[in-house]
Amino acid sequence: MTARRTRIKFCGLTSAAEVALAVEAGADAIGVIVADSPRRVTLDEAAGIALAVPPFMAKLGVVVDPPADLAVRLRSFGFTLQFSGDEPARVCETLAHGSAYVKAFHVDGAAEDASFERIEAYTHATPMFDTRVDGKAGGTGIPFLWRIVESIAKRRAVIVSGGLTPGNVGACVRALRPYAVDVRSGIETSGRKDIDKMRAFVRAVRDADAET
């Protein structure tokens, strides 16, 4: 019996050198942030990073309520769009231009948020669940209660983000069996990508996969 394989995305990459680290560690996808963030990159930088991503590795452009021209440019570089703001379904569907994309939904309570009921409206999206703390959505470094999205994860492919680290991602994979996991600060030391943490993160996911 073949073990399932959880996809792994390393987010917040800022250079071709960090892409090389992600490849070495065994990530399936990388993300660049073209929105307000300490790890924000310009469009020109995103284009350069895209050229460093090898074939068969996915690349995502993270945006927040983006203008149409930004979405068009990112798609022209080969990025799959990841909408991490309050974008309604019609906007995401229009800007993705019929292509698959990722839509972030933010978790800040002890039960499924009402916004989860609207997931089906995002026809071409894979939903990603991330943490919201004190009004800050994403980039908190704090995990949410995974049981909140357990029922959704049983029904469809989901991506889990928010406070994942080499120390807890295995438990997340065992609990939810998500399609993918997404990590940013959990593979960093002093704000920079750490190859040892990147390898440990991948190893923890693969160990959990093997227990299926």
Please place each PLM-identified region on the residue numbering:
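Conserved N-terminal beta1-alpha1 strand-loop-helix module at the mouth
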Residues: 1-212
